[in-house]
From Swiss-Prot:
Residues 623-691 form the S1 motif domain. Mg(2+) binds at D487, D493. One of its GO terms (molecular function) is 3'-5'-RNA exonuclease activity. This is Polyribonucleotide nucleotidyltransferase. Keywords: Cytoplasm, Magnesium, Metal-binding, Nucleotidyltransferase, RNA-binding, Transferase. It comes from Xanthomonas oryzae pv. oryzae (strain KACC10331 / KXO85). The keyword NAD does not apply. One of its GO terms (biological process) is RNA processing.
Length: 704
């Protein structure tokens, strides 16, 4: 195939899609250029599904190579290792809008690999990777109901910005990524500075409108490349088996969905499934019905029963009305030795959230392609298997946990103080102890309380809520505070976090086409009402940050010295600073501009370290009297330490008004003496006098 190139303007970027020259053995391969940021994106689909495969094995890997930024990786091995948090998040970003566009029965393995090969630090690779994945799938001839496109939207001075650069985003009130087909929005991911629902919805529609040109370009590329449509055919439905299953189930599932408790409902449905499949086993053997097919169709009946019940009765499976939020319990200060903690329970979803305060030194150093930087606000989300009553793998966080942690972090980011306002590294950990839907939003609520309990001066409390949708034809219902089953069996997962003032984070995943702007508008308004209700319930626990830090949290003292004095504080080989930290039990961070931050759980120790540093950095003033210690005896006089690191000479003639034959007769090493500073010469040498003090000259150094 000859090389095919498509170039177009997308926001302020010139975008080029190329195929036919590189990675020609892949099912589909595209070079995507956003100015100097260049990615190779490939898509490969297996020819057939594995025997017994009962799920769609789609894997997406986004990777940033260090050579793309002209850097060599750190570490011992000097090569890229496991995926970074950013790579994991962008992999999920690509996966989410693509997965629902494959047919339900398609079980062939599909792998998408997006490799950043050249990176302009001002142009991120996320939108290029999404566009490249869509183009590669379109070229691979898979049964992919695309193409999709993506756009990033910023917001500044009341104007939307298409595909803002990293620099643009620094003073943008919004960073929103939207992906979708020509007719529908499928995915939204965003963080915002407390914007209104109208502005957020406007950004989604703006991005969807602007991405249409990309969809047209991908279609043209596929046509010119001569891509053949997929020959995959969905397996035929076994109508006899489905009819027999429906007859055997009868109205048992409808009754089971009336059970309000999650675990009891799950047990009831499992019992029905076991009985029905057992009753049908003899006929299944005769007819040749596979057990997997029966189980799949039973799941389809579950899906239809729950959806039909909600649409017809407007009552949900736990008995709530469509817009009712589950009962909420919120407590702050639940763990005695942590710096801040909260327990947030909403129905059968529960999170214990802990805040820990550290110094700037505790920040996480990120070794990225665009350069090294430090992260001083960390948010970690843990989802242990016991939270849903199961046994399972326990260890390193999975992709889902990283994604949920990032969403919860986005929820509170807009209200966090700057490092200048609150010079602590802050780590928030959300431990999900129970889960029945919306655990990431429970993490937002719990983190808001835990931060306030720790005394972090957040601008306002934050709450989050997950919305759902059930839609059949023109009939639809929007659900507030969805359960796990409603998320699994519904058409939309729509998470909104924010304060009473506005939205701080929005995440949307839509499984169907046909969701209109009006439906999204209703969902946002219903979410706002739910969010305000949750904030009201949280107010029973805590409404403002505590004025005092925990007794176990480090106290920070900040002082400023002249940058030229830094070497005096550090001392030869770090001896001075090490002595201060060892003697006072403090942690001291020195910045290049002369800012010194002293951290200690003990306020008295911090003050002692501060005094030591002030003594070291204070200038010796001629005419002042200091109390010093005799450091060394010489034939011609004695050296006296008057400040840490500052020795002066008392000449033999300045020891006493009487004649001194031998210095050792008057002074001994270790003696405390009062001396007057006679002179500090250009070389910094200090001349001292004991005699002048005895004669009543000089002013004490402590006097102002």
């Amino acid at each position: 195939m000859a090389k095919i190139t498509k170039t177009f303007q997308y926001g302020k970027h010139t975008v080029t899609l190329e195929t036919g020259e590189i990675a020609r053995q892949a099912g589909g391969a595209v070079i995507v250029k956003f100015d100097d940021t260049v990615l190779l994106v490939t898509a490969v689909a297996a020819k057939s599904a594995r025997e017994g495969q009962d799920f769609f094995p789609l894997t997406v890997d986004y990777q940033e190579k260090f050579y793309a930024g002209g850097r060599i990786p750190g570490g011992f091995f000097k090569r890229e290792g496991r995926a970074t948090e950013k790579e994991t998040l962008i992999s999920r970003l690509i996966d989410r809008p693509i997965r629902p566009l494959f047919p339900e029965d398609y079980k062939n393995e599909v792998q998408i690999i997006a490799t950043v090969m050249s990176m302009n630090p001002d142009i991120d690779g996320d939108i290029a990777a999404l566009i490249g994945a869509s183009a590669a799938l379109s070229l691979a001839g898979t049964p992919f109901n695309g193409p999709i496109a993506a756009a990033k939207v910023g917001y500044k001075n009341g104007e939307y910005i298409l595909n803002p650069t990293v620099t643009d985003l620094k003073d943008s009130q919004l960073e929103l990524v939207v992906a979708g087909t020509a007719n529908a929005v499928l995915m939204v991911e965003s963080e915002a500075e407390l914007l209104s629902e109208e502005v957020m919805l406007g950004a989604v529609t703006f991005g969807h409108r602007e991405m249409q040109k990309v969809i047209n370009i991908i279609n043209e590329l596929a046509v010119e490349a001569g891509t053949k449509p997929s020959d995959w055919v969905a397996p035929a439905k076994n109508d006899g088996m489905i009819a027999a299953l429906k007859e055997a189930v009868g109205d048992q599932l409808a009754s089971a969905f009336q059970v309000r408790d999650k675990l009891q409902r799950r047990d009831a449905i499992s019992a029905i499934k076991k009985d029905v499949l057992g009753a049908l086993a003899p006929r299944a053997t005769i007819e040749g019905w596979a057990a997997g097919d029966l189980a799949k169709e039973f799941g389809e009946l579950e899906y239809q029963t729950m959806r039909g019940s909600v649409l017809s009765t407007k009552v949900r499976i736990d008995g709530r009305a469509l817009d009712t939020v589950r009962p909420i319990s919120a407590k702050a200060g639940v763990l005695p030795r942590t710096h801040g903690s909260a327990l947030f329970t909403r129905g059968e979803t529960q999170a214990i959230v802990i805040t820990t305060l550290g110094t700037a030194r505790d920040g996480q150093v990120i070794d990225a392609v665009s350069g090294e930087y430090k992260e001083n606000f960390l948010f970690h989300y843990n989802f242990p298997p016991y939270s849903v009553g199961e046994c399972g793998r326990f260890g390193a966080p999975k992709r889902r946990e990283i994604g949920h942690g990032r969403l919860a972090k986005r929820g509170v980011l807009a209200v966090m103080p700057s490092l200048e306002e609150f010079p602590y590294t802050i780590r928030v950990v959300s431990e999900i102890t129970e889960s029945n839907g919306s655990s990431s939003m429970a993490s937002v609520c719990g983190s808001s309380l835990a931060l306030m309990d720790a005394g972090v001066p957040i601008k306002a409390p934050v709450a989050g809520i997950a919305m759902g949708l059930v839609k059949e034809g023109n009939d639809f219902v929007v659900l507030s505070d969805i359960l796990g089953d409603e998320d699994h069996l519904g058409d939309m997962d729509f998470k909104v976090a924010g304060t009473a003032e506005g939205v701080s984070a929005l995440q949307m995943d839509i499984k169907i086409e046909g969701i209109t702007e009006e439906i999204m508008k209703q969902a946002l308004q219903q979410a706002k009402a739910g969010r305000l209700h949750i904030l009201g319930e949280m107010a029973h626990a805590l409404t403002t940050p505590r004025q005092e830090l925990s007794d176990y949290a480090p106290r920070l003292l900040t002082i400023k010295i002249h940058p030229d004095k830094i070497r005096e504080v550090i001392g030869k080989g770090g001896s001075t600073i090490q002595a201060i930290t060892k003697e006072t039990g403090t942690q001291i961070d020195i910045q290049d501009d002369g800012t010194i931050i002293i951290a200690s759980v003990n306020a008295i120790a911090a003050q002692a370290a501060k005094s030591r540093i002030e003594q070291i950095t204070s200038d010796v003033e001629p005419g002042r009297i200091y109390e010093g210690k005799v450091a060394k005896i010489m034939d011609f006089g004695a050296f006296v330490t008057i400040l840490p690191g500052k020795d002066g000479l008392v000449h033999v003639s300045q020891i006493s008004s009487e004649r001194v034959e031998k210095v050792g007769d008057k002074l001994k090493e270790g003696d405390l003496v009062r001396v007057k500073v006679l002179e500090v010469d250009k070389q910094g040498r200090i001349r001292l006098s004991i005699k002048a003090v005895e004669e009543g000259e000089g002013v004490p150094a402590s006097a102002e």
